[in-house]
Amino acid sequence: MAASREFIICCFLTLLLCNFFMRVESGAAADVSRGGCGGGDGSLGDDNERCVEAVKEDDDDDVDDVYKVINKMRIYA
């Protein structure tokens, strides 16, 4: 019961494709270890610590610009 040539080529191409996707995924994970949490060495300080980006002081929510009361007037539709 020998495996056909097409089956072996299909398995080899599947292996190459999976290897490509693993490299792409590990490249995205490497970005976290370069900067963010735990001092840049890729480790977290505590077991329960999560990587959270610091919020800038001048960061303003857009909600303030959407809902405004102008001259305390009511608008009826």
Curated annotation (Swiss-Prot):
Disulfide bonds: 37-51
GO biological process terms, semicolon-separated: calcium-mediated signaling; cell-cell signaling
Top-level division of the source organism's lineage: Eukaryota
UniProt entry keywords in alphabetical sequence: Disulfide bond, Hormone, Secreted, Signal
Similarity comment: Belongs to the plant rapid alkalinization factor (RALF) family.
Purpose of the protein: Cell signaling peptide that may regulate plant stress, growth, and development. Mediates a rapid alkalinization of extracellular space by mediating a transient increase in the cytoplasmic Ca(2+) concentration leading to a calcium-dependent signaling events through a cell surface receptor and a concomitant activation of some intracellular mitogen-activated protein kinases.
Protein known as: Protein RALF-like 17
Organism: Arabidopsis thaliana
